[in-house]
Amino acid sequence: MPEPLPTETVPPPKLEVEETPQEQPAIGWIQVITRCAGNARALAGVSVLVTNGTEEQVHLEHTAVTNESGETGKIPLPVPAASLSLNSDETRKPYSTYDVSVYAYGFYRQVSEAVPVFAGKTSRQIFHMIPLPSYLQEPPKTIVYQNTEPNL
């Protein structure tokens, strides 16, 4: 019978990995406010979607519904660290952009595109909800607001 081989524990080789400092993601917020009747009345029960990505691949980040004051709570969203704005050689934007869509029965759908969100700050999006004419059951189109990205 063959003699068993001695068992010897060999530690795995140590890998030399050069770590590059990574910016820790930060948090910024979006708060949605909905009004109607020429800003005279808050609109409760409005569905809110916060998305990002491209037309081909949209990522749902958050959903909410407005309260009796016509507002959502502050919606936390991942954004780059504010320290990016301190480096003049940095090519990445020191903020993220999100699309905010609002839906309510009897009103036109609206979307605010490319809403900039910065670390530690709240971007307030105010929507003036427009009622549908009585002969329409569904809105024929979505009202789109294009935001201009900050020139930093």
Task: Please provide the spans of the model-predicted regions.
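Short, acidic Ser/Thr/Gly-rich low-complexity loop/linker segments typical of extracellular
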Residues: 56-86
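Hydrophobic beta-strand segments
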Residues: 46-53, 100
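Short strand-edge motifs at loop-to-beta-strand transitions and within beta-strands
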Residues: 72-73, 113, 123-125
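A generic structural motif
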Residues: 49, 79, 115-116
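Short beta-strand edge segments in extracellular beta-sheet folds
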Residues: 114-120, 128-132
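Beta-strand-rich domain onsets/edges
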Residues: 1-42, 58, 64, 137, ...
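A short, solvent-exposed loop/turn motif at the edges and junctions
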Residues: 86-114
